[in-house]
Amino acid sequence: MADGLDIRVRLDGFDRLVRSLDSVDVGQRTRLFLDGVGHLIVSEARLRAPVNVGLLRSSIFHEVDQQEPPRYVDVGSRVRYAPYMEYGTGTTHDHPSWPKVRHIPFVNRDEDGRPVAALFWYAKRKGLGFGGGYAIARAIAKRGGLMPRRFLRGSIEDLRGRIGERWVEVRDGISRHIAGGGQA
């Protein structure tokens, strides 16, 4: 993905399970399971996502693998700044491959070409006045960067148990079907 953030949830042991099955529609059951997992993670991530105007929160999506049977679900956001909200920036980030360099918010230019702090419009919406954007930028620079918000990774970590339980239910239902227990 060129812009945005994408985290993949992969099913361990899935290939072994598929090889042992011929009589069951594993693809359909797995697709329903992964779609449900995607919805679950998206719902939790939207609750955790930082909100300014709601663009990041509303952009969180999930997409199930298109191959048959599906093996993963992607959950992410195509908003350009999503990775920086997830991992943080500067010296405070927790991304495994980004350099630890102090983050100093850049300067944008307004319609007339005058320099305006990148956070000026945010500060104005929050009622902090003209100097508010500069004060926020200064605080970010002093701290070294934005702190990680972990809205996606935190959701996956907290839901790991529920996802595992659901996968066991799907797996056991398939096993019962194969053993002659009928539809599960």
What are these regions (language model features)?
Residues 1-184:
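Short, Lys/Arg-rich flexible segments
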